Curated annotation (Swiss-Prot):
Motif (Endoplasmic reticulum export signal): 637-642
Record key words, sorted: Endosome, Golgi apparatus, Membrane, Signal, Transmembrane, Transmembrane helix
Transmembrane regions listed in the UniProt entry: 286-306, 356-376, 382-402, 423-443, 456-476, 507-527, 539-559, 578-598, 605-625
One Gene Ontology term, aspect cellular component: Golgi apparatus
Signal peptide start-end: 1-33
UniProt gene name: TMN8
Keyword tRNA-binding among UniProt keywords: no
Side of membrane Cytoplasmic, spans: 307-355, 403-422, 477-506, 560-577, 626-648
The protein's name: Transmembrane 9 superfamily member 8
Pfam families: EMP70 (PF02990)
Lumenal topology ranges: 34-285, 377-381, 444-455, 528-538, 599-604
Location of the motif Golgi retention signal: 646-648
Free-text comment on this protein's domains from its UniProt entry: The C-terminal KXD/E motif functions as a Golgi retention signal, certainly through the binding to the COP1 coatomer.
């Protein structure tokens, strides 16, 4: 029996090592993931009209998006809202038509968009947005508008791109200390295109802008034929950065103008997003991978030592005992065989959390597969969030199945009650936090507030699809025969001896969460930067590697600590296995708090509440995901070792 256990343990460890090695090799060359465009390419002939769209105003200081036309910019005769998917609405996107008129490959200079005379209210609105460093986001042919910024990186010049341009800027006139607000009222657009030599048709591969603040002047009365003296296409006078800036004050007249330049590019349409997705910190990601792999190898060595040496020796010794007296003299994990599968306290709640963890695990895994295949690229705006929501809903089937299977193993009979709690506990907590945050956003009149129609759609996804699927999964899982325990449970619980200080439940649980968090914290930095500093994150190959390492780390650290716990004759492993790996969520939230105070510039109370509210939801989801991994690892481990020894 011992040799059979040894062989099975070796096979498991070898297959696990091969699996990790195979995954690593699969992604070592394509860690960025490849890109499948979210839309079909569109060809433009010379003179074709190009439709520019405006999106939300964004700020990393407030994290509150606003509609472009919430400020008194020049408007088209009729504002038309673009159709948006669920993810776009939840992100606060508000895509609308713009008054800009572009003709393909026809340069324009100093086009007058319109003029606005500021009153006290509009001047205050512009000043507030400038002070909060809001950026204007636009879209052309599904490409976001970027501002090119030249910088010197390691002695060589390079260009980085920032999404959107600032509404304005703050500064002082020469010789004055009084701070003034200036408006970016002239935009110099550059549209880059790739031309087909055979057909002469062109495809757009870049959309850039350089914003200027200029106090436009003109002679005579204002009319449709007015020519500006500060920017005149007839005299080829261009706007320059040294021009007198346009101040934002009450009763000031602001004239909005723009240039359009077209530049041919060697970049092909299929590669046009490379500029936006180009990452210059690959070395840091690889360091993260290597760092995490070192943790995995260390834990794998410990697990191998336990399973291939200690357990083999223990099982051989236990199986060779001749008398009951000799067995009673032994100490260690075998002594608790009659209690190790005793029903845990709050077993119903454990079933619910395990089912929810399976739902989270399935959602994350499938989402990453789609992301690596390119279906959730940034060109598919809102696609990532939409996919995660829909996958969460449909993974309810597996949540119900997992919770009811465990519930039946615990000899439960009321599977409908478990299915109900599985369908409602986690979503109810998340929804309560979400509704409070949404109310705060509504109070700020931000476009980030979820409309009632979208709210109804979310409720329908929950009650109309997710809940029934949880019950279907629960029914299927409960109908299957329960897994038998490898050993019988004694009627009278065994007394647990006094434990050493390092085996204290709270201490061991907190220690157990450090390594899983250590495996992901570097990648977590880039994810937080992407979310809260308005940058692209599209390195799902790296992320998938880290995710696999996280799974292995959670499983191994929990198994190691579970073994030490059983050797101390403490058989209350059910909840502790869940909390050991799940405690990594506590470190995630603490790191998010550290990130808030060291990297973000948020000053408003509402914005801070939004940040910590969303990070609380993320930490809660991380808790159930990692906790479930640790629980199943320990369940497999205990069933394996106790099925491999002779029990009299």
């Amino acid at each position: 029996m011992a040799m059979e256990f040894l062989r099975s343990s070796r096979r498991i460890l070898e297959s696990s090592g091969c699996a990790i090695a195979l995954i690593f090799l699969l992604f070592i060359h394509g860690a960025h993931s490849f890109y499948l465009p979210g839309v079909a390419p569109q060809d433009f002939e010379k003179g074709d009209e190009l439709k520019v769209k405006v999106n939300k105003l964004t700020s990393i200081k407030t994290q509150l998006p606003y509609s472009y036309y919430s400020l008194p910019f020049c408007r088209p005769s009729k504002i038309v809202d673009s159709t948006e998917n669920l993810g776009e609405v939840l992100r606060g996107d508000r895509i609308e038509n713009a008054p800009y008129s572009f003709k393909m490959r026809e340069a324009q200079m100093c086009n007058i968009l319109g003029r606005v005379t500021l009153d006290a209210k509009t001047a205050k609105a512009f000043k507030e947005k400038i002070d909060d460093e809001y950026r204007v986001n636009m879209i052309l042919d599904n490409l976001p508008l970027v501002v090119p910024i030249e910088r010197v990186d390691q002695g060589s010049p390079s260009v980085v791109y920032q999404l959107g341009y600032h509404v304005g800027l703050k500064g002082q006139y020469e010789g004055s200390k009084e701070q003034k607000f200036f408006m970016h009222n002239h935009l110099a657009f550059t549209v880059r295109y790739h031309r087909d030599i055979q057909t002469d048709a062109a495809r757009i591969v870049g959309f850039e802008v350089k914003p200027y603040s200029v106090k436009h002047e003109y002679e005579g009365e204002w009319s449709e034929k007015t020519r500006l003296t500060t920017c005149d296409p007839h005299t080829k006078r261009l706007v320059v950065s040294s021009a007198t800036p346009q101040e934002v004050e009450q009763k000031k007249e602001i004239i909005f103008t723009y240039d359009v330049d077209f530049q041919e590019s060697e970049v092909k349409w299929a590669s046009r997003w490379d500029t936006y997705l180009l990452m210059s910190d690959n070395q840091i990601h690889w360091f993260s991978i290597v760092n995490s792999l070192m943790i995995v190898l260390f834990l794998s060595g410990m697990v191998a030592m336990i399973m291939l040496r200690t357990l083999y020796r223990d099982i051989s010794r236990y199986n060779e005992l001749e008398t009951q007296e000799e067995a009673q003299e032994e100490t260690g994990w075998k002594l608790v065989h009659g209690d190790v599968f005793r029903l845990p306290t709050n077993s119903d709640l454990l079933c619910v959390y395990v089912g929810t963890g399976v739902q989270c695990l399935g959602m994350v895994f499938v989402t990453m597969i789609f992301a690596m295949l390119g279906f959730l690229s940034p060109s598919n705006r809102g696609g990532l969030m939409t996919a995660m929501l829909l996958l969460w809903v449909f993974m309810g089937l597996f949540a119900g199945y997992a919770s009811s299977r465990l519930y039946k193993m615990f000899k439960g009979t009321e599977w409908k009650r478990i299915a109900f709690r599985t369908a409602f506990l986690f979503p109810a907590v998340v929804s309560a936090i979400f509704f409070v945050l949404n109310a705060l956003i509504w109070g700020q009149k931000s476009s980030g507030a979820v409309p009632f129609g979208t709210m109804f759609a979310l409720i329908f996804l929950w009650f109309g699809i997710s809940v029934p699927l949880v019950f279907v999964g629960g029914y299927i899982g409960f109908k299957k025969p329960a897994a038998d325990d490898p050993v019988k449970t004694n009627k009278i619980p065994r007394q647990i001896p006094e434990q050493a200080w390092y085996m204290n439940p709270v201490f061991s649980i907190l220690i157990g969460g450090i390594l899983p968090f250590g495996a992901v914290f570097i990648e977590l930095f880039f994810i937080l930067t992407s979310i809260w500093l308005n940058q692209f994150y599209y390195i799902f190959g790296f992320l998938f590697l880290v995710f696999v390492i996280l799974i292995v780390t959670c499983a191994e650290i929990t198994v190691v600590l579970c073994y030490f716990q059983l050797c101390s004759e403490d058989y209350l492993w059910w909840w502790r296995s869940y909390l050991t790996s799940g405690s990594s969520a506590l470190y995630l939230f603490l790191y998010a708090t550290f990130y808030f105070f060291t990297k973000l510039q948020i000053t408003k109370l509402v914005s801070a509440m939004l940040y910590f509210g969303y990070m609380l939801i993320a930490s809660y989801a991380f808790f159930v995901l990692t906790g479930t991994i640790g629980f199943y690892a320990c369940l497999w481990f205990t069933r394996l070792i106790y099925s491999s020894v002779k029990i009299d």
